[in-house]
Amino acid sequence: MRIAKTIAGASVALSAAAAGAQLAEPVHVRNLNPLVSIFGLPAWDTVPIGTRFGATAEVANHYRFSLQNNERLRLDGETVRTNFAFTHGFGSGWSLGVEVPYYRVSGGVLDDVIDGWHSAFGMPDGGRNGRPEGELLYAFGDPLEPSFVLTEEQSGIGDTQVKFARLIGRDQGFVVQASIKLPTGDEELLASSGSSDWSVTLLRTRPLLARKRAASYYWGVGVLRAGDPDLIPFDAETWVPTGIIGGSWQVLPEFGLKGQIDVHGAFYESQLEEIGETAIQATLSAWRRMGQRGQIEFAVVEDLNVSTSPDIVLQVAAAWQW
């Protein structure tokens, strides 16, 4: 009888810990603007208990034509980014993690869906209907002679990120993380900047488990030191601030909702708004626990500062912890 009670108590404790961890875990959002995703913007991670493996797939459709003085930018295509992340948490509150993304750049399949959405609700399409659907064209640089042109579908590995994190604070509710991005990816398809970046972030997480329906909030600030990209003709900023604020609500024992806002400064000294202004993205997601060790999450990411990030990003993520 005592053994049964002990097992039941341990199961409840594990379930509560898993719920608290999922509530306090931000959605892993990155700006998939092709000229921004080459940099090492950090994902906002918590320190896991034990080992965690995650896989995230996201798709972003791009359509921007911009000209300012001697700078020109053309983006017409689609990015599918699949990210594999492995993190191990040590008993002392430290964690070590690594992320490796895989990119596929193509004309995509969402053009028709987006055109239909704009037509159905009478929304402006920015000239999308004037371009062939499913076409890939990335070109930027001098208006007369672009220094970079991509017109053929490609795929390849992106830059690897290595992360070190530490829990601090009286309630262990702060996460300090340092990360470095290594130039392991393919620059020719904009999966790499060709240089190393490093960043330092501080994340505050606060699960509120003593409520009728558990909830949480989190916020974070950080800074990234960006290396000079090899193939991009625009002058890059050296220091880029970043931040996050969000929360989660556990609607049912195995199901919850999240909302958050991610922001980062401009990565380029450019008059083009797509790369020379602050980016703000809003995310809504729904997550579900899969047993004691797994979870799956679906998210929609929308740009709040129009043109600085993809109009919409669809994301699905799965994670397992042991």
Cite the ranges covered by each PLM segment:
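Short N-terminal leader segment in a subset of presequences, especially plant chloroplast
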Residues: 9-13, 32-33
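Transmembrane beta-barrel domains of Gram-negative outer membranes and organellar outer membranes
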Residues: 21-191, 195-227, 232, 238-321
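Bacterial N-terminal signal peptides that target proteins for export
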Residues: 1-8
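N-terminal signal peptide c-region/cleavage motif recognized by signal peptidases
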Residues: 13-20
